[in-house]
């Protein structure tokens, strides 16, 4: 199977800072004085992780909170760069990494559809042609013309996934943003992801819901303590993970 995601010996580090200022005025007027880089101190998000994902595969990243799953998705999506190693992808990548990502809080849901869909590679005419399908999928009703600053987290998830549902990516990347939606909408999203898979779209996503992983995924990548622990079939890795978490 031809790999369309190649994650090769990737390490991502972030510098650590500590607060040495005396109060909020220092933060506003003297930010350089208020924060000081802890020389030599870094946070290691992931370390020497390698994996590939083949064209048309559905793969889940699992692991404890803070293990490095979301960092890995961000690297594949291209929103962050590795400290070491290389990350390459082939084709159009559509990602939903955080609630409200790619949206402007002062714009309405409808206006944000134009904004987000454009960021995902659709032309304005294509957005217009798909607008009603996006709105119908979102189930937001009259709220579609309200500014999204009044939206709940569940409504933001609905809007974001509704746009994703109408793009035509080669690679679909989803962090665990679906967990905030209602059960019926979650089921609709899972079915949409399965439909993407049937059409040959490559899927990489993070989930703590092993039932969803089993429904969608061919393989699972288990990240533990910022390193790759296991890669294998969904059934085998999920069983190992459940045993480790027990």
Swiss-Prot record:
PROSITE patterns: ABC_TRANSPORTER_1 (PS00211), ABC_TRANSPORTER_2 (PS50893). Keywords: ATP-binding, Cell inner membrane, Cell membrane, Membrane, Nucleotide-binding, Polysaccharide transport, Sugar transport, Transport. GO terms for biological process: polysaccharide transport. Its main location: membrane. SUPFAM superfamilies: P-loop containing nucleoside triphosphate hydrolases (SSF52540). It is found in: Cell inner membrane. Belongs to the ABC transporter superfamily. This is O-antigen export system ATP-binding protein RfbB.
